[in-house]
Amino acid sequence: MAAMSRIIIAALLLSVTVQAQDARQALTAGDGPDPWFGTFSIIAFDPATNELGVGVQSRAFGAGAAVPYAKPGVGAVATQASANRQYGPKAIALLEQGLSPAEVVKRITDEDPGRDTRQVAVIDAKGRSAVYTGKRVIDRNHDPKDLVHLGGFAGFAAGPNFSAQGNTLASEDVVKAMAAAYQAGKGSMAERLMDALDAGQSEGGDTRGMQSAGILVVKPLPANSDSTVERIVDIRVDDHEEPFKELRRVLNMTLGVPNRLTERSAQLAKEGKFAEAIAEQKKALEINPRNEQAMYALAQRYAQAGDTKQALEQLGHAIRRQPKQWKPQAAADPIFAKLASLPEFKKLVLP
C-alpha cells in the first residue's frame, strides 16, 4: 500500500515544477520589526468556481492573520519568512493594474531592501503564479551568531492554478506532498487547501513544529445576486498545540458539516440503523462540542436506540446549557415518550 501511494504521488507530480534552496541553517528571525513566519502555504485559483484561496501553517503566532491576502477576481498572495505585510496589498493593487504575477513579484521585491529575507507567492485570476525566495531565507554564509541552527528547506512546487511554498521545512517532500494532495482533491477549494496543509505536515512540515494555521477563500459576487459575501471561508487558529486538527474542526463548522451529520443521523434512526445514527451524531458533536443542539440530538438517538442511561445523560448536558429551551422541548418530544414516567426524566424537564 505504501509503495502504491508513492507511485500515485509521483505520477501526480509530473505536472509540477519544483524549485528549492536546501541548507543546514535557517533564519528564524528577520531584520527589524518584521515577524518571522517560517512556514508553508499554498495559493490557488479554481477556474470552475472562480475562487481564489490561501492556506497556511506556521510555528509562529497568528500566521493566518499575517500571511494570506486575496481579492475576488484579482488574485491571492502569501507573504512569509521575514514577512513584509505590505506585499499583500501592493501585489493585489499591481495585479489590478494588469501586471502578471511574475511582474508583480519582481516589482515588489526590487523595491524592498529587506527582500533577501522574504518569501512571497502570488497567483492571479487566470491561474498564473510566481514565487520569490530570498537568498537569506536559508543562508549558508550568513554569520552563525545571527542564526538559530535548524535543518531546513525553502522552495516551492507549482502546477496549473496553484503553488505550494515554504521555508524552514523538513524537506522538499513537504511542498511536493502539498502539490499532490491539492491536485488529487475532490472537495471544495477550502477542503483541498486543508488537505494540502495536512499532506505537508505528514512529510514533516515546519522543522520547528506547529502553532497557527489559516484558510482564506474568496469569490466574486454573481451578477444580480442578493449575496454580499465575497469571503467564502475566512478562518484561522492563532495559537494551538494541534492547529491542523483545530483548523479542520473550524472548517467543518464553517461548511455546515455538523448540520449535515445531524440530518443524516436522524434519517438513519428513522431507518432503524441506530448504531450508525449514534456514530454520525457523535461526529457532529466532536466538531462542535459545546453545541447543546448536537447534545440534544444525540440524546434523541440514544432514546430511539433504547439506551435510557445515555439518553438521560446527553439530555442533561443540553438542558444544563440552555434550560429554557430544552426543558419544554424535551417534555413535549415524542421521541422521549418512553422516558416520561421516569423520575430522572421528570427531574430534568420539570420547571
Where are these regions (language model features)?
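Terminal, low-structured helical/coil segments at or just beyond the last alpha-helical repeat
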Residues: 324-351
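N-terminal nucleophile
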Residues: 22-260, 264
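Canonical positions in the second alpha-helix
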Residues: 283-284, 317-318
